Every structure is written in C-alpha cells, then in structure tokens.
Amino acid sequence: MTVYHFVGIKGTGMSPLAQILHDTGYQVQGSDIEKQIFTQAALEKRNIPIYPFSADNIKPGLTVIAGNAFPDSHPEIAKALAEGIPVIRYHKFLAEYMKKYTSVAVTGAHGKTSTTGLLAHVMQQAKPTSFLIGDGTGRGNESSEYFVFEACEYRRHFLSYQPDYAIMTNIDFDHPDYFANIDDVFDAFQNMALQVNKGIIACGDDEYLPKIHANVPVVYYGTGEENDFQARNIVKNTEGTTFDVFVRNTFYDTFYIPAYGHHNVLNSLAVIALCHYEEIDVNMIKLGLESFGGVKRRFNEKVIGSQVLIDDYAHHPTEIKVTIEAARQKYPEREIIAVFQPHTFTRTQSFLDEFAESLSAADRVYLCDIFGSARENVGKLTITDLQEKIANAELIEENDTSVLKAHEGAVLIFMGAGDIQKYMRAYENVIA
C-alpha cells in the first residue's frame, strides 16, 4: 500500500485530510515548517510523522499530496515530479475521495468553519459521518454515509468539487488580493451552485444568495417570511439562544443552542434545513445542537481571575461585528475590549474604514501590527493608519501586554487570523 506524504501537512485543510486518511486505515506522513501550529496537535495525537521540509523526504512508494500554497518548484514536489512519484494537489485528491459518500460542502464568506463543525456534530448523532473542518479538525470513519467538508471560495478552489449538497451561508467581498469586487465573488458562487448534484441550502436573508441560479432545488433559510425554513420567536439571553423553526410556514419545533449572536441562529438553521431534507429525526438534531461545544478559534473562552479571555479567528469587519455582538449577549454587564491583529495588507487597505467601524463597537480597542501573509509580507500601509480612525485606540506589543490588566472584570477578545494567539499567551503569562 502506498504511503501518503503531505507537503504542508499543518495546513488547515491538509491536516484534517491527513487525519481522515489515517482514521480509515491509510499510512500517512507529512512535512512542514518547524514552527508550532495549532493544527498539528491532532496529527501528533495520532502519531502521524511530521518532518521538516527536505527533498530527502521524497522516496519511492509515496503518493505526494501537495498543499495549494506550494508551487511545483518546491524542493519536495520538484523531486517527486522528476522521479515519477505521483503528485496530486489537495483539492483534486479531496474531490475524488469524497465521491464514495453523500457529500456536503459548506461554503460562504463567513461562518464556514462553525457551520461545518456544527453540521458534522449533529449528523453524527444519526449517521456515521466523516468530516473535514477548516480549524484543522478531521475524522474518518470507514462506514460513513456522509462526508461533510468546508469548501473555500478563495482562488475559486471550491470549483474543484461536485458535492451532492452545498450549504451557502452568505456572500461578501473578501480576499481582495484575488477577487476584483463583489460581482467577481458572486460569479464564483454562481459557478459553484451549478456543480451541486442534489440540493442547495442557502441563506435567504443574504443580499446576494437569492439571485443564485441552480439546476437543483434551492432551499432558503433565515428570519425573513419568504424563507422555506424560518426562525421566529428568537429569545437571546446569557445562557444561549432559543428559537422556533417554521418549515414553509408550518411549525416544526423549538430549538435551543448554547451559543450567542444572530449569526449562530442562521448557522443552526442551515444545519436544521439540511438534516430535515435528509430526514434525520428532529430529536437527534436537537440533541446535536444542544451538545455542540464549538470549533477551534471561534469564541473560545478562558476565565483568568476577574477577566474573560476569548480567542477568535475574526479577521473581516463582518466577523468582528458579530463576535462583539455575541460577547455583549453573553456578558451584557461587562466591559468589552477588542485586541485585534489585522490579517494581510491588502485586506486591511481594502476595508480600513469598515474595520474602524466594526471595532468601534467595543468599549476599548488595542491594535497589533499587521500580519502579512506568505503571499505579500510587506505593504505601504501601517497599523497607525487604522489606529487614527478609532477613538482612543492604542497599539500593543507582544512583549508589553500588561496594559490590559487595567480592565478588571472585562471581556478581552483577541481577534485575528495570523498569530494573535501569541499576544494572548503573552498576556496569560503576565497575569499567571
């Protein structure tokens, strides 16, 4: 049997795919940078070998699965190609692998990871389900009927897939280094819709998704009356959220989620709609929703002394807005502090005013230096350009986070898609 070698095994898609193959009996190994990344814990738990990048890793008998971030000139990929060792790109391999299951793609500008995690958790209550979540979590089950996976629109990667179902959470302008404008983003989702084989579950409250055309049924969810699945009588409190679901204006059931913010009602509705479509028992759905513990880097809380520290992946103005709203729902009496690290110069430049507006919903804002991606690293913009647009915003350094101690009893939300976690760890060390 071949050994699958992952070039870039710590990637947020690559790591869960390696976990899935391992769980279903394949021999797996991989290589990556030596820096500790949150996606590697699950690999280490399974004793999957992780090597530093080196052409010496490439040997006969391997099948190389190459991460999208690495060109054919990468030493390992180049050697494999030169020696006739099979090389398959991540999305091509995944597209072929999922064909043996009923596949569900979860896509959208925001909410992909949380919705994928929730759907996988709920479906597992009823049927064996394999899943690939963009927080680095994957699980394979040889007897699975379903394969639930996160599908990203960036560089139109999701057009590699032809899933049975697709959940579309929303369409928004992001990834300005690739997409020209919102119409370009819509075009990508429209093309994706035409590749779905059985049905699409889409948010009808979204500005753009109702304009999608497809060759399969499109079921809409949301709070608007025109939706097929509608949430009514939404009650939000410090313990979570309760709401009634009506299916085409007929009462279906009442649901409770231990989650906060309107976006989590919509994510739950998407899951309820798909499970209803697949005739999964409503009690199984309710059990799954009520017992879901969340996904990595999405509103992950830690209480230290009088403060609540929250780690969140929010890196777009829309995501920052809903994360702060969720914190206010759960902690209405507390001061909300935003500690934000912008991710990529292009995104920061494109949404400078929107970032300022979203962050201003917090009671106080602290800003970290811009995290440049591997694709750019430098830009003319600096963090002070954002600071100047936010009243009383302060800059914060990893080696000097002690200023946060002044906010006794506050909720501190550390937000970003880069290495914002190192700032949170640094602060934890200060107050330990």
Curated annotation (Swiss-Prot):
Entry's Gene Ontology cellular component terms: cytoplasm
This enzyme's EC code(s)? 6.3.2.8
Q: So, what pathway does this thing act in?
A: Cell wall biogenesis; peptidoglycan biosynthesis
Residue sites binding ATP per the record: 108-114
Protein origin, superkingdom: Bacteria
The first-level EC class reads ligase
Gene3D superfamilies in alphabetical order? Mur ligase, C-terminal domain (3.90.190.20), Mur-like, catalytic domain (3.40.1190.10), NAD(P)-binding Rossmann-like Domain (3.40.50.720)
Q: Name one GO molecular function term.
A: UDP-N-acetylmuramate-L-alanine ligase activity
Reaction(s) catalysed (UniProt annotation): UDP-N-acetyl-alpha-D-muramate + L-alanine + ATP = UDP-N-acetyl-alpha-D-muramoyl-L-alanine + ADP + phosphate + H(+)
| Subcellular localization | Cytoplasm
The family database entries (InterPro entries) matched by this protein are listed as: Mur-like_cat_sf, Mur_ligase_C, Mur_ligase_C_dom_sf, Mur_ligase_cen, Mur_ligase_N, MurCDEF_pg_biosynth, UDP-N-AcMur_Ala_ligase_MurC
Q: Does the keyword Nuclease apply?
A: no
Can you list the disulfide-bonded cysteine pairs?
Answer: none
The cross-references to Pfam families, in alphabetical order and at most eight, read: Mur_ligase (PF01225), Mur_ligase_C (PF02875), Mur_ligase_M (PF08245)
Its GO biological process terms?
A: cell division; cell wall organization; peptidoglycan biosynthetic process; regulation of cell shape
This protein's record includes keyword Cell cycle = yes
Give UniProt keywords alphabetically.
Answer: ATP-binding, Cell cycle, Cell division, Cell shape, Cell wall biogenesis/degradation, Cytoplasm, Ligase, Nucleotide-binding, Peptidoglycan synthesis
Any idea what job this protein has? Cell wall formation.
User: Would you identify the family this protein belongs to, as annotated?
Assistant: Belongs to the MurCDEF family.
Q: What is the protein's name according to its record? A: UDP-N-acetylmuramate--L-alanine ligase
Query: What is this protein's gene name?
Result: murC
